[in-house]
């Protein structure tokens, strides 16, 4: 019963409802009407109800057409009632007071401001998609921010507007009059004839023509920048201003001749716009600040906003005339290029065309020739610029800082304020800071720097402590890469204590020789073995840094054990001093080879021999508890010593002793303090030196000089 009551309560089917149903249904639903014939039966009541419900839903758009204009939906139909901007006569789109549409005024104002400084204006194409969207928006009356759009896009849209004017801007009916006026013999006659023809134009056409010719004249006067003189402008925009009514039926050659005539006419109008329309054309092309574009900025907004430095708020950069403030720029050009409204009072004061051209040139310089701070990044490699709170953006300031930083780095060797230059240590400066306990294998890369820097750095590192001349650095040897104990200078990168480090390491070069360097003898490095503890290694490094340049007797043991074993430094492993002695004792316990044999097997290029016997060395180094017996001094004869081996000192050995050219200057003061910091082997050497007589101390000193020579070479 409820179904039936709902059926009775609804509208009955009639002809109007059927027409609405058929119009709104799809093709598949057209076959439904056979069900309507059997609607009297009770079986089809449900189907009829569904059809009627569907009809109500589908007929909703038809109800929208019956709504009154005062309803809420009247706003959606409002754009359809507006007149489109394009393809309309100027008499329809212009106001009652002969005012141009607001979008056309805005476009002409922007072209007047930015056109003279834009290369290829009216010639370069724009995006087709953007052009269509802008035309649709202007046709529908949508508010568009034209200041943010590219100038070329506005020029293309304006040409479309001229092309869509019925009968064209110069009126096709006056085509013969324009051509006849142009054929006058003299220029004055042509100007007078063109004035008469222009007077026959409709009022809106004449108004737009004056504004357009003024803008084109300004652009042509700045052809050095925009590459568009009056001839080029006439070629690009002339066919949109004047054509024949039946130009579509003309042949190609006829159209070409027609376009050439129009081009000559438009070019003459551009060049003589002030003579034809009077000097007051500028006052007619004036808008107040309340009219178009709302205080139009003369700055190139699109260019500035796309620039990376547009939002720069650097306080110490003085603003220039071109980029200081857009509102300030408006004060100059606004009275001249103000825009396109004749409702205000006409100004009686007239100026020449040269003044307008100069105003455009100044406008162009303010827009285009901006300060270089807008396009160039800041270059401040100096440390002061990196640490300073504000980076200098002036080009001159950045150049000054860059030059000063370069000069400071170049003249750093000549200044005495910072004697610890980092340029001497390129390998260390390029790596991060390492802990002290790490073994740096590539410390010899620091010797690859120029000789002048190293010599300067170490000669002025400690003026009061320099005991000898600094040696010329020898080329880095690959066989001595693993030495880390006897370094000539430190590899620390800590800059907090530069003066202390200089005084430590400058002594290592004060004992070195610069006159003669003995041939290199390969030896096993004195690097600490890896099983040593970290504390022991740090202690040794600290002791050696304080005793840099002093003779460590372990080097002599290294030479002796190296020559006895005949090892080569082709491998990369190293032995400590104790391990070297143990290895020698294991092979030949208590019987090392003679001095001559060791020299013969290991260094065949050594022509001069040492100044002491193997027995004396063995007794001093391997027997610390027993005193070395005094060796009689024989000058010019053979020397012998009471050693277990009974070796004799040959004349070659005597010659090697006296031909040693290593010159060392040693401070004897403070020797007692240094004795306390020596290693075990140095303590043994001290006891042996005390046992020797004054006449035999010369031999030990010569052996010390040999170690100094090796230290200097490294």
Curated annotation (Swiss-Prot):
Biased composition annotated in UniProt, kind: Basic and acidic residues: 492-501, 527-545
Biased segments, Low complexity type: 459-471
PROSITE patterns according to UniProt: RHOGAP
Tissue specificity note: Highly expressed in testis.
InterPro entries: ARHGAP20-like_RhoGAP, Rho_GTPase_activation_prot, RhoGAP_dom
Domain Rho-GAP: from-to ranges: 88-277
GO biological process, one term: signal transduction
Bias-annotated ranges (Polar residues): 299-311
Keyword check for Phosphoprotein: yes
The keyword Phosphoprotein appears for this protein: yes
UniProt-annotated site: Arginine finger, residues: 123
Gene Ontology MF terms: GTPase activator activity; guanyl-nucleotide exchange factor activity
Post-translational modification Phosphoserine, affected residues: 398
Keywords: GTPase activation, Guanine-nucleotide releasing factor, Phosphoprotein
Region (Disordered): 290-357, 370-419, 451-508, 520-563, 623-650
Function according to Swiss-Prot or TrEMBL: May function as a GTPase-activating protein. May play a role in transmission ratio distortion (TRD) in mouse, in which heterozygous males for t-locus transmit their t-carrying chromosome to 95% or more of their offspring.
Protein name: T-cell activation Rho GTPase-activating protein
Organism in which the protein naturally occurs: Mus musculus
Gene label: Tagap
């Amino acid at each position: 019963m409820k179904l039936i009551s709902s059926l009775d309560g609804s509208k009955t089917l009639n002809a109007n409802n059927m027409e609405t149903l058929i119009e709104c249904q799809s093709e598949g639903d057209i076959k439904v009407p056979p069900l309507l014939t059997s609607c009297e039966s009770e079986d089809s009541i449900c189907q009829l109800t569904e059809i009627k419900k569907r009809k109500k839903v589908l007929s909703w758009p038809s109800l929208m057409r019956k709504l009154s204009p005062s309803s809420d939906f009247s706003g959606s139909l409002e754009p359809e009632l507006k007149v489109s901007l394009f393809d309309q006569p100027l008499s329809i789109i212009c106001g009652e007071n002969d005012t141009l549409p607001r979008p056309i005024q805005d476009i002409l104002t922007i072209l007047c401001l930015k056109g003279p400084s834009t290369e290829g204006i009216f010639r370069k194409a724009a995006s087709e998609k953007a052009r269509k969207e802008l035309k649709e928006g202007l046709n529908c009356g949508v508010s568009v921010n034209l200041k943010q759009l590219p100038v070329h896009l506005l020029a293309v849209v304006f040409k479309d507007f001229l092309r869509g004017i019925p009968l064209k801007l110069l009126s096709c009916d006056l085509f013969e009059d324009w051509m006849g006026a142009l054929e006058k013999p003299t220029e004055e006659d042509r100007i007078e004839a063109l004035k008469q023809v222009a007077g026959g134009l409709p009022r809106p056409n004449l108004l737009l023509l004056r504004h357009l010719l003024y803008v084109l004249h300004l652009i042509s006067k700045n052809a050095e920048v925009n590459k568009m003189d009056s001839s080029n402008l006439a070629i690009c925009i002339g066919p949109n201003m004047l054509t024949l009514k039946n130009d579509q039926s003309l042949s190609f050659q006829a159209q070409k001749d027609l376009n050439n005539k129009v081009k000559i006419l438009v070019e003459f109008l551009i060049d003589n716009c002030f003579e034809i329309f009077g000097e007051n054309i500028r006052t007619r092309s004036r808008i107040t600040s309340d009219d178009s574009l709302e205080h139009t900025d003369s700055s190139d907004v699109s260019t500035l906003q796309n620039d990376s430095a547009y939002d720069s708020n650097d306080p110490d950069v003085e603003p220039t005339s071109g980029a200081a403030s857009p509102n300030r720029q408006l004060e100059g050009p606004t009275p001249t290029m103000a825009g396109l409204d004749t409702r205000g009072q006409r100004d009686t004061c007239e100026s020449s065309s040269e003044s307008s051209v100069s105003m455009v040139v100044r406008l162009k310089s303010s827009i285009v020739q901006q300060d270089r701070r807008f396009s160039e990044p800041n270059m401040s490699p100096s440390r002061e610029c990196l640490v300073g709170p504000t980076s200098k953006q002036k080009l001159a300031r950045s150049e000054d800082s860059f030059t000063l930083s370069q000069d400071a780095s170049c003249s750093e060797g000549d200044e005495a304020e910072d004697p610890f230059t980092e340029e001497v240590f390129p390998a260390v400066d390029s790596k991060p800071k390492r802990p002290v306990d790490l073994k740096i294998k590539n410390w010899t890369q620091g010797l690859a720097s120029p000789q002048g820097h190293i010599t300067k750095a170490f000669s002025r590192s400690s003026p009061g402590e320099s005991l000898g001349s600094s040696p010329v650095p020898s080329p880095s040897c690959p066989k001595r890469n693993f030495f880390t104990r006897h370094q000539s200078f430190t590899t620390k990168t800590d800059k907090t204590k530069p003066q202390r480090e200089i005084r430590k390491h400058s002594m290592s070069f004060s004992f070195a020789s610069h006159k003669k360097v003995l041939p290199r003898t390969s030896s096993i490095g004195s690097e600490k073995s890896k099983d040593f503890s970290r504390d022991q290694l740090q202690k040794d490094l600290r002791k050696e840094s304080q005793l840099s340049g002093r003779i460590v007797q372990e080097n002599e043991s290294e030479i002796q054990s190296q020559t006895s074993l005949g090892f080569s430094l082709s491998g990369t492993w190293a032995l400590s001093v104790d391990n070297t002695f143990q290895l020698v004792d294991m092979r030949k316990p208590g019987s090392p080879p003679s001095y001559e044999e060791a020299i013969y097997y290991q260094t065949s290029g050594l022509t001069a021999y040492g100044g002491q016997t193997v027995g004396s060395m063995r007794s001093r180094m391997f027997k610390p508890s027993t005193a070395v017996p005094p060796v009689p001094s024989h000058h010019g004869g053979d020397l012998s010593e009471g050693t277990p081996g009974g070796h004799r000192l040959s004349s070659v050995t005597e010659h090697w002793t006296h031909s040693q050219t290593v010159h060392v200057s040693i401070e004897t003061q403070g020797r007692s303090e240094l004795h306390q910091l020596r290693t075990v082997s140095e303590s043994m050497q001290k006891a042996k030196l005390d046992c020797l007589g004054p006449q035999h101390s010369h031999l030990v000193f010569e052996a010390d000089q040999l170690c100094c020579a090796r230290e200097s070479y490294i």
